[in-house]
Amino acid sequence: MEDDFLFMTLLYDFYGALLTDKQREIFEMYYLNDYSLGEISEILDISRQGVYDALKRAEDSLEFYEEKLGLVKKHQEMMKKIEKIKECIKLIKEREKDEEILKIIEDMARELEELNP
């Protein structure tokens, strides 16, 4: 359940701007501000079922965008590769004695840190 929650918020980070204003508002209230469906219903003066339907449409839209574009998957794969490269750099730094090579490695590590803080 928590993984679904995190995945939905990650999808929202990438594709949230593609949702309608109402879907975005309801999604943010539910996922980001931790309102219940009933609370959202009262605040927006719509039925609980209406809130549920709008939230479900938003979730379906986000999943559809990911299915078609795959940006989240690509991002996650890139982050894994960056971590692997950082581990390799660390091992090389521990074994390398040449100062020039160490400087190059330090520069590479710094650039990777900028990509993945």
Swiss-Prot record:
It comes from the Bacteria. Gene3D superfamilies: Winged helix-like DNA-binding domain superfamily/Winged helix DNA-binding domain. Might take part in the signal recognition particle (SRP) pathway. This is inferred from the conservation of its genetic proximity to ftsY/ffh. May be a regulatory protein. NCBIfam families: PRK00118.2-1, YlxM. Belongs to the UPF0122 family. HAMAP family: UPF0122 (MF_00245). This is UPF0122 protein TTE1463. It comes from Caldanaerobacter subterraneus subsp. tengcongensis (strain DSM 15242 / JCM 11007 / NBRC 100824 / MB4) (Thermoanaerobacter tengcongensis). The lineage of its organism: Bacteria, Bacillati, Bacillota, Clostridia, Thermoanaerobacterales.
